[in-house]
Amino acid sequence: EGTLCVITEIKINLVPRPTMTALGVVHFQDIFGASDAVQHILEHDPSSIEIMDSNVLERSRQSAGLASNMGFIEGNPGAVLVVEFYGESETELTAKTNELKEDMARRGHGYATVNMLDRAAQASVWAVRKNGLGLLMSMRGDAKPLPFVEDTAVDPDRMGDFVRKFDEIVRNHQTEAAYYGHASVGCLHIRPVVSLKSQEGVNKMVSIADEISDLVKEF
């Protein structure tokens, strides 16, 4: 956002739609552990990695429309990484998801990995991810998770350090943030919880935005 470019010519490559997909949902105690694991998950060549923190997960559990979708969650994770793989057969996808699960256990990333080959089960996960924004905005009170530092993008290898520093800035302003987004490419939707119904809240938003702008430049 805010990037301007002029394109005079562009060639777009088309690829076949995958015959099958599978998910590995890796559970973590907090958003930092999830961020640290991304660089190692990328070694498995997934088609995508999406991140959701406890704000999204808890509100999904409390939602009448999504509570039944939450069977893929084990325990009370602080964050999950939804890792998607493409494949041509169930055998191929079983091997890929099992390799991910074994690697996460070997490296000590997360406390559980739930593998999913069933299409309906995968659709339940994506429904939670898709509806995350609406659920976040339903937070009670004047303070809401606001999109004024959306789409910060960093090298996935450095995501753990970036998220820790981002969180430090937010907490120094006596608030918290909701995290979700496209972890595989280092592009996160991080929404600090701020009220715009007071001058203090507006000042807080501006201050956080200034500090996050400087932080992104460091990375």
Regions found by a protein language model. Give the residues of each.
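Noncatalytic alpha-helical scaffold of FAD-dependent oxidoreductases
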Residues: 1-219
